[in-house]
């Protein structure tokens, strides 16, 4: 039996979703981490980049723990994100600008 998996990170407007698939495309586990919405102007929405980053790490950790697998068993990673989104990270500190 092949014990390798595909990890998908879906970074949406309201939450970070992480889904683990087996090689047959079946969902093994899923995790959802909601993040706070900020509305500085009508029709605008902003997010805390640090919160998103932490949500991604926590969701991945939870998926690996719940599925009882290691990162070594992840054979592929897919990432989807919000359209029309920009985020800048400081090269020296690794922190969001």
Language-model features, listed with the residues they occupy:
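N-terminal glycine/serine-rich phosphate-binding loop of ATP-dependent small-molecule kinases
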Residues: 1-97
